């Protein structure tokens, strides 16, 4: 067994909704802990899946190259097909990156806090993980701090943008300024899983950097704004030379036919994504106003969640859970991550949080 495996804790997935409802005797559970799209999935997806099942091809292996999906993503993002690597969610892409590029002699730089799988897969490969705390006042990535810890062993820097769990968005210019100062043999991978929820995704994306730098890649997923968390489709856009390396170790039939069909249908319904993002923006502003009024510290988010801190945060999370609202805890002491739900959930939750805060005063 690899030595690094002994150093990691197993990922704890979300409990099934029915189990949580049964445990707390709930008629309804608003799961606002996993950053899922509360508005469901495009109706085109259901139609496409039914047609695919009726075609009766489930006894055949899927298209190992995801040809239709590859062509559509390439067209929408204006990138070549051989720059794309598809995975079973971004989880697989992150794992592939670690397996392909990291050795026990390498170092990986990540923000603290950041998505846990960056460090997890680096540790599995025996690489050292250097965490650089975000700005405590704003939550922004500390580019100067990251540059200070980069050395000859640094093989990879992860930038989650917007960052999970803080929700903070870095500008493409700030990231490019950083890339220019990073050694050319150090990879900079930018995870844009939540970019669709930003105020202006087209201006916020770092995709143009992939064309300008041979050590930069951008990751995207259909699990969030597209509402396909259950289907598991993610992809990376990278220079052809890097993509070819990942393709060598990717499982040949990793995306099943139903996943490919669902992804194509979802990508073709951009109106659904824009509508979900617009609703999210409205509710996100309500939460920011609420926290401002209540004097609660939070980080300005450009994602579909808000990261905030209160004393006795675990008690607040438990209180909300017993009322049918599940938020994400155990990320940092006294910090909670709240997935932004629909308007009706916002109204009820804010009343519950306000009441809890009064009791704590």
Swiss-Prot record:
Co-factor requirement: pyridoxal 5'-phosphate
Pathway: Amino-acid biosynthesis; L-histidine biosynthesis; L-histidine from 5-phospho-alpha-D-ribose 1-diphosphate: step 7/9
Catalysed reaction, written as an equation: L-histidinol phosphate + 2-oxoglutarate = 3-(imidazol-4-yl)-2-oxopropyl phosphate + L-glutamate
InterPro entries noted in UniProt: Aminotransferase_I/II_large, HisP_aminotrans, HistidinolP_aminotransfase, PyrdxlP-dep_Trfase, PyrdxlP-dep_Trfase_major, PyrdxlP-dep_Trfase_small
Cross-referenced Gene3D superfamilies: Aspartate Aminotransferase, domain 1, Type I PLP-dependent aspartate aminotransferase-like (Major domain)
Alphabetical UniProt keywords: Amino-acid biosynthesis, Aminotransferase, Histidine biosynthesis, Pyridoxal phosphate, Transferase
Sites bearing N6-(pyridoxal phosphate)lysine, chain numbering: 224
Entry's Gene Ontology molecular function annotations: histidinol-phosphate transaminase activity; pyridoxal phosphate binding
Enzyme Commission number: 2.6.1.9
Domain of life, per lineage: Bacteria
GO biological process: L-histidine biosynthetic process
One matching Pfam family: Aminotran_1_2
Family: Belongs to the class-II pyridoxal-phosphate-dependent aminotransferase family. Histidinol-phosphate aminotransferase subfamily.
Name the record gives this protein: Histidinol-phosphate aminotransferase
Taxonomic lineage of the native organism: Bacteria, Bacillati, Bacillota, Bacilli, Lactobacillales
